[in-house]
């Protein structure tokens, strides 16, 4: 039997709270689903990896960068979901320096451009979109009639607090989950809300793809502060209603006051998601990295990265 086969991938979510969902859980699920739809075998693992496999790691810097060193760098891809270049951004320059030594997939072209100029080239940095997939809506929570006008799941900042005050002054009801919620933990709040809101924390204002995922799949309209879009996943072409900071409250009112507009928003977003092209970006990246060549996929043991 020929021991060489098409490459097999594994999404490695570093999550100190597993099996509860956390920051990267939704993105990890969508990546697994998208890679499978592209025609490749792909598993999703929490806090462990097959050391001879091709790993795509989420949360490496935050929850286990030392542990990730146990993996072969030439078979390990770091998926960056942070906003690079913001003066107040976590985790800042040390993280960028760490990324320069690795293979990186990134959700946004703005981050790629920054790394290309500061790292002297882009040969190991690739834009790969996070595409919403139906698995995010299979949490077992049945749809219900909306009870809350605005769902806002985010950490606190003065500009966000000001928007919440303005929404309340406009007579809107708000469910602000401070610090955020994720995956199945977010689902109950999602299904009882008329709209989901995004207001930026960092001045880079990169379009927050991960904040769109579950709302897009569950059919909840989204209002977002104006964002810097990216070529492979330009949410301005969807039904998301973008507005400048001072116009966010009015944008929320526009959707909340009109069930017809909310329906149109959802339909446009679902159409947009259905047309997003993941496979091409993924194939281009793994071909450039040489991962489409045959390699041994014989049995090997998993390594727990938190042990």
Question: In which residue ranges do the predicted regions lie?
Answer:
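A short, charged/proline- and glycine-enriched loop
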Residues: 2-9, 50-52, 142-150
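Catalytic binding pocket for nucleotide-activated donors in carbohydrate/polymer assembly enzymes
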Residues: 7-16, 22-36, 40-43, 113-121, ...
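Extended catalytic core of nucleotide-activated donor transferases of GT-like folds
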Residues: 8-120, 134-135
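Conserved catalytic-core segment of nucleotide-activated headgroup transferases in glycan assembly
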Residues: 20, 131-192, 259-260
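Hydrophobic/aromatic beta-strand patches that form the interior of the parallel beta-sheet core
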Residues: 56, 77, 103-105, 124-126, ...
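Short beta->alpha connector loops
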Residues: 59-64, 82-85, 110, 129-132, ...
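Short hydrophobic/aromatic-enriched beta-strand-loop microsegments
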Residues: 78-79, 122-129, 175
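Short, charged, surface-exposed secondary-structure boundary motifs
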Residues: 86-93, 114, 134-140, 162, ...
């Amino acid at each position: 039997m020929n021991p060489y086969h098409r490459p097999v991938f594994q999404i490695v979510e570093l999550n100190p709270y597993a099996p509860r969902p956390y920051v990267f859980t939704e993105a990890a699920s969508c990546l697994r689903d998208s890679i499978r739809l592209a025609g490749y075998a792909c598993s999703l693992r929490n806090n462990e990896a097959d050391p001879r496999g091709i790993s795509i790691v989420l949360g490496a810097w935050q929850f286990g960068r030392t542990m990730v060193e146990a993996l072969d760098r030439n078979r390990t891809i770091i998926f960056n979901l942070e906003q690079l270049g913001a003066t107040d951004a976590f985790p800042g320059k040390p993280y960028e320096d760490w990324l320069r030594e690795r293979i990186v997939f990134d959700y946004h072209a703005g981050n790629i451009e920054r790394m290309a100029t500061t790292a002297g080239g882009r040969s190991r940095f690739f834009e790969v979109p996070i595409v919403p997939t139906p698995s995010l809506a299979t949490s077992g929570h049945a749809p219900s009639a909306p009870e809350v006008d605005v769902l806002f799941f985010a950490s606190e900042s003065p500009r966000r607090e000001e928007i919440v005050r303005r929404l309340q002054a406009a007579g809107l009801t708000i469910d602000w989950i401070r610090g955020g919620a994720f995956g199945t933990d977010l689902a109950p709040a999602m299904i009882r809300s008329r709209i989901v809101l995004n207001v930026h924390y960092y001045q880079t204002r990169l379009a927050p793809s991960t904040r769109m995922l579950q709302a897009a799949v569950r059919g909840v309209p989204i209002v977002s502060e104006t964002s810097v879009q990216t070529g492979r996943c330009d949410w301005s072409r969807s039904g998301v209603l973008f507005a400048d900071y001072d116009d966010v409250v009015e944008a929320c009112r526009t959707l909340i006051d009109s069930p017809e507009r909310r329906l149109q928003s959802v339909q446009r977003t679902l159409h947009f998601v259905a047309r997003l092209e993941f496979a091409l970006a993924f194939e281009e990246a793994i071909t450039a990295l040489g991962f489409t060549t045959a390699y041994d996929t014989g049995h090997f043991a998993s390594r727990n990265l938190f042990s």
